[in-house]
Amino acid sequence: MITSTSNQQIKKLSLLMKKAKERKEQDLFVVEGVKMFGEAPREWLAGVYVSEQFVSNEEHRKLLSDVPYEIVADSVFRAVSDTQTPQGILAVVRMPKYTMDDMLRGDQTHLLILESVQDPGNLGTMVRTGEGAGITGVVMNR
């Protein structure tokens, strides 16, 4: 069990949570909460951290049955968590990388192609709308 915020794994986790540059350099991101953990493909998981309280629940242990995880002291988990009331589970996830060939493969390819979107709010709206319309990928310039 991890009992200190000085633990190397916790330091790395904190850095990933706080620094976009670090996430980009390592091709990793962090998800928090039961729903987000459940939606993350298992093969993309690079690490799972759970609080003592979380793992003491039988249903939660079933959720973790197919993945290795680290138990973190409740106080340490609260310190590293990004939310006001943590659910008790954080996962480090590998960012998938797709080539254009990957996106064009398949019978039902529907791409949203964007150029020079300046407002992040507009980008989010377009992606959510596209998802509702059944897009299978997004292509955009920097």
What are these regions (language model features)?
Residues 54-68, 100-109:
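Short, glycine- and charge-enriched coil/turn segments that flank and shape catalytic ligand pockets
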